[in-house]
Curated annotation (Swiss-Prot):
It is found in: Plastid, Chloroplast thylakoid membrane. Binds 2 heme b groups non-covalently with two histidine residues as axial ligands. Binds one heme group covalently by a single cysteine link with no axial amino acid ligand. This heme was named heme ci. This is Cytochrome b6. GO terms for molecular function: electron transporter, transferring electrons within cytochrome b6/f complex of photosystem II activity; metal ion binding; oxidoreductase activity. The gene is petB. NCBIfam families: PRK03735.1. PROSITE patterns: CYTB_NTER (PS51002). It comes from Drimys granadensis. Heme b 1 binds at H100, H202.
Length: 215
C-alpha cells in the first residue's frame, strides 16, 4: 500500500496539498455562525445524493408523476426515508442559506476585497430559491400545481414581454407537460450544474481572501 501511495506522491505531491488544506489559519473570532455556509454545502450534497436516488423511480409525466412519488413513499425500499431526507434537507438548506447571508452581511463580508465572493454568493442564493420552486412542482399534486401556476403567472403583469415570458417558463399557454419537463430538467440538471460552477468560484475566493474580521 505504501508503494502505491509513494507512486502518487512522487507525481502529485499529495502530502503538500493535504498540508496546505489542513494548515490554513483560522482567526480567533470565528464562531459557530461561520459554519452556516458549510452546513448549506452539506445540505446541497445530501440533496444531490437523495435526488439522484429518486430519479430511478420518478417519472416526469403529468399522468405518472404523482403515482411515481406515491410508489417511492409506499413501495420502494427506503423510498419514504430518502424522500423525507430530501424534503427536510431542502428546507434546512434554504434556512441555512438565509442565515449565512445575514451573517455575512452583518459582519461586513461583502466589502472590499470580497465583492466577488458576495456576488457569487448572491447568485447561489438565487439558485437555491430556484431549486425550491422547480422541485415543488415535481410531485404534480394540487399544492405543487397551483404554486407553479401562480409563480409562472407573475411575469404576466409586465407590459409587452409579460406573456412571452410566461409562455417561456411554462412551455405553453397553460401549466402542463411542457412545464413539468422544463422544471424537471432545470431541477435535476441545469440548476445543479450552475450551482457547482458558482461553488467552484465561491470557495477558492474564500480560501484566498480568508474570513472577514470581527465587527
Amino acid at each position: 500500500m505504501s508503494k502505491v501511495y509513494d507512486w502518487f506522491e512522487e507525481r502529485l505531491e499529495i502530502q503538500a496539498i493535504a498540508d496546505d488544506i489542513t494548515s490554513k489559519y483560522v482567526p480567533p473570532h470565528v464562531n459557530i455562525f461561520h459554519c452556516l455556509g458549510g452546513i448549506t454545502l452539506t445540505c446541497f450534497l445530501v440533496q444531490v445524493a437523495t435526488g439522484f436516488a429518486m430519479t430511478f423511480y420518478y417519472r416526469p409525466t403529468v399522468t405518472e408523476a404523482f403515482a411515481s412519488v406515491q410508489y417511492i413513499m409506499t413501495e420502494a425500499n427506503f423510498g419514504w426515508l430518502i424522500r423525507s431526507v430530501h424534503r427536510w434537507s431542502a428546507s434546512m438548506m434554504v434556512l441555512m442559506m438565509i442565515l449565512h447571508v445575514f451573517r455575512v452581511y452583518l459582519t461586513g463580508g461583502f466589502k472590499k476585497p470580497r465583492e466577488l465572493t458576495w456576488v457569487t454568493g448572491v447568485v447561489l442564493a438565487v439558485l437555491t430559491a430556484s431549486f425550491g420552486v422547480t422541485g415543488y412542482s415535481l410531485p404534480r399534486d394540487q399544492i405543487g400545481y397551483w404554486a407553479v401556476k401562480i409563480v409562472t403567472g407573475v411575469p404576466d403583469a409586465i407590459p409587452v414581454i409579460g406573456s412571452p415570458l410566461v409562455e417561456l417558463l411554462r412551455g405553453s399557454a397553460s401549466v402542463g407537460q411542457s412545464t413539468l419537463t422544463r422544471f424537471y430538467s432545470l431541477h435535476t440538471f441545469v440548476l445543479p450544474l450552475l450551482t457547482a460552477v458558482f461553488m467552484l468560484m465561491h470557495f477558492p475566493m474564500i480560501r484566498k481572501q480568508g474570513i472577514s474580521g470581527p465587527l
